[in-house]
Amino acid sequence: ACRQFAMANPQALYHYDLHTAIRPSHRERFALYPFVEGRTVPVDQRDFLLEAEVETLLLQHKAGTTFSSFSSSLLKAESFTMELGKVRPFGQNDLGRFSGIQDALRRRFRGLPSPAPQPPFDHLTVFEVVHEILNTGKNFRFHIPDDVANFTEYQPGTVIWEDDETSYRVGHSPE
């Protein structure tokens, strides 16, 4: 269905895969930009993220298995996976916290560009993924508790994960 849609709509495609996080985060809202060889984030997409009150962007270092990776690599869409804050129990979510993404999407649907970034959402902090964690099987051990926030800095020597054959330990600089 996605391929048919892309073929029927040859103009620019945009895909924003919106999520709320289960894990806490030191950066409440962030986006992941799927890796596509030679591609950079267009200025209008950076402006869109800031209008949506997303101030943190992670650049993935290789193709992934997410829906946004599929749509960017195979359908040539400008795609992001966007984490919009921590989910609360049903009925306890403050919908006002989603006004940024709501306004940005409404403007996009009308075909209007994002306004020039304004404080406090006028700077996008960009990180590059350097290592990904993949569950390698039955003897995989992940050493980060579920209640540790995303974007926590780990000191050199910290073991992040291991299995019977290998492990990932933070190198000489904090990560």
What are these regions (language model features)?
Residues 1-175:
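Structured catalytic-domain cores with a bias toward divalent-metal coordination
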